């Protein structure tokens, strides 16, 4: 619950009151409030990592869930106004990116839907999945991945920090262009990662809606949410065990491993 307390303190500093009170345990009053004013928030971007068919995506969400869909933009709106809207949303939809840290302001029981561009494996980039599933957050996480290369728009001539690869050797450029899955790497200057994460995406609406439908089937009700969930660290990698005999009567055993991915 520490993160929720932190979010609450930040909101108080910004003079923000939560739009929809979904914090309480289950009950008919809460259900009535949700039905009256539920809405979905979609993060809109105007420079990079665009959702090319954003309007179509918004319409699909509205039709599927029969509730209002609003967009927010950190490029065009103040941070407090964005937080105000997110704090009352039942779902937050966004391309992978730092703006998803605002999911910590979502009310309990809300869903986080993270979109990933082509060749970017959701299983390898899990900070926001981890945040959503921390004890006390009580958020439902769903990811969608673009698997159709024809639905992506790349920008090889941009500056390297925005995914450009024109500065690389021809052999390396060709390898990146031919790759269908970004290999594991350390954040955040890997050129293949930057090239792929800064793509624009034409979201395949049928597959997106199907992923949402399947994902929402496993969404627990507020009555079933418990704050006793467990957090599992990432798999232990490159474990090493060393022994050091100092004297006939004294020895040391040292175990080390790589920092976990999450």
Predicted features, each with a name:
Residues 1-260:
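The feature primarily captures lumenal catalytic ectodomains
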């Amino acid at each position: 619950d520490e993160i929720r307390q932190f979010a609450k303190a930040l909101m108080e500093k910004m003079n923000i009151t939560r739009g929809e009170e979904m914090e309480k345990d289950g009950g008919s009053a809460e259900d009535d409030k949700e039905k009256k004013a539920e809405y979905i928030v979609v993060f809109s971007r105007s420079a990079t990592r665009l959702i090319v068919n954003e309007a179509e995506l918004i319409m699909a969400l509205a039709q599927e869930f029969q509730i209002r869909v609003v967009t927010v933009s950190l490029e065009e709106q103040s941070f407090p106004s964005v937080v105000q809207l997110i704090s009352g949303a039942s779902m937050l939809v966004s391309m992978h990116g730092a703006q998803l840290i605002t999911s910590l302001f979502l009310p309990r029981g809300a869903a986080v839907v993270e979109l990933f561009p082509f060749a970017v494996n959701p299983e390898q980039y899990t900070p926001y999945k981890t945040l959503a599933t921390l004890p006390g957050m009580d958020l439902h996480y769903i990811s969608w991945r673009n698997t159709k290369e024809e639905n992506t728009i790349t920008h090889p001539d941009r500056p390297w920090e925005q995914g450009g690869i024109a500065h690389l050797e021809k052999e390396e450029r060709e390898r990146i262009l031919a790759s269908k899955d970004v290999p594991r790497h350390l954040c955040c200057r890997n050129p293949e990662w930057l090239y792929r994460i800064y793509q624009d995406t034409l979201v395949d609406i049928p597959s997106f809606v199907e992923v949402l439908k399947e994902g929402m089937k496993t969404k627990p009700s507020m009555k079933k949410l418990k704050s006793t969930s467990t957090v599992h660290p990432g798999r232990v990698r490159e474990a090493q065990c060393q022994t050091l005999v100092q004297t006939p009567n004294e020895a040391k055993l040292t175990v080390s491993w790589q920092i976990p991915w999450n």
